[in-house]
């Protein structure tokens, strides 16, 4: 157990900085390439939010209801709503409290040391096709 912990924490600072950079890059890409994207809570504050997660929503469109399905078909791994409502067929009570009465599709992206800027470019390009 001690060896596993040692290995997990060996490069933690470098990996944290790398992942924060990816999240910042995705925020900048979304803001510059998708009109009217909205971010939930403080998730754009890299130092005051969970650095491995970005939650946002997009303008309503004819593809809104099928956004998650279409992203999956196009090879983008992401989740709908909040982690608190994962697996539920009902909307997220957490996100509803942040953005009440929103019909905008919400998406949650997660980042790890295994992601790249190319992954983000791919995801944003697919989003641009759908929103």
Language-model features: locations:
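Pyridoxal 5′-phosphate
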Residues: 2-131
